[in-house]
UniProtKB/Swiss-Prot annotation:
Residues 1-25 are annotated as: Disordered. Keywords: Membrane, Mitochondrion, Mitochondrion inner membrane, Repeat, Transmembrane, Transmembrane helix, Transport. It catalyses: glycine(in) = glycine(out). The lineage of its organism: Eukaryota, Fungi, Dikarya, Ascomycota, Saccharomycotina. GO terms for biological process: glycine import into mitochondrion. PROSITE patterns: SOLCAR (PS50920). Mitochondrial glycine transporter that imports glycine into the mitochondrial matrix. Plays an important role in providing glycine for the first enzymatic step in heme biosynthesis, the condensation of glycine with succinyl-CoA to produce 5-aminolevulinate (ALA) in the mitochondrial matrix. This is Mitochondrial glycine transporter.
Amino acid sequence: MTNAATDKSVASVARDVSTGKPGKSPDAAVHLLSGGLAGLTSAVTLQPFDLLKTRLQQQHSETSKLTIAGEIRKLSQLKELWRGAVPSALRTSVGAGLYFTTLSKMRAAVAQYNHRDSSVTSVLPKLLPMENLATGFVARAIVGYITMPITMVKTRFESNIYSYRTMGESIVGIYKDIGPDGVVHRSSLLNFFKGSVATLARDCPYAGLYVLFYEGFKNDVLVKVIPESVTGSDSRSSVINSSSAILAASVSTTITAPFDAIKTRLQLTKETSILKTTGILLREDGGVFNLFRGLSLRFGRKALSAGISWCIYEELIKSDFSQCRLFNKERLA
């Protein structure tokens, strides 16, 4: 969304949830901070899901029995489940803040161009299905590439192939392309973008499909399912947003699961080809099911993360937080 003090016309994109009347569009800083807080909360809370998923995906199924319980038993301390929480929190909070800001601006621009208002349960503009798909796809592509170096650090940290003790050590190790055997290969900044194509092939369709399903469930399905007796209450809005997020994440996660398995294997090995990596996964014991390895963990993590993140984000945007003096430039003028 654009600044209300400099662009009055975009204010029509947002509605007051209690009255249904056009309201003030939140400042971009509000979207950035709200998205960041939402992402940070979900990242720290759900880090064990990410770590276990990475551990499962890094292994060759013919040499190890792949079970979640087996991976947990390998941990010497419970706190190891949160290994990689710092880069994960950094990536998710920064990524979520940038993503929500970019997405809100793109959606506001499209809605303004088409002269559409926001939905009753959301301050976000209501778009057509293909517009939801396109804006989510493009926003994730931009933010995903920007945060790719943090994603690389996060994946290496979560893996037990590399015994990094600090983020600084992992950054040096990735830059110098130091393998698990300690051998230095090719030093390059491009090492931080290894697996970026597979990552974007996973995240962009996921984001586009997610926004498509999220808006569909929220505006066309759950609005009709949630009892009218709580219409207009804050609880109804929260339930609709969280339920829509969980359902959308579940469907989108299943569709894009193969790219997640390929991405993780690329970032933890010397292989650079998506096609070769896919072939290796298919030839291992388990065949095509290897492309869905760790799906249950990603499924649970994405669903819970979406429910937490989007609920916190939308409720912060609609709350008095977005009208506080810090973000209201008209009051400061």
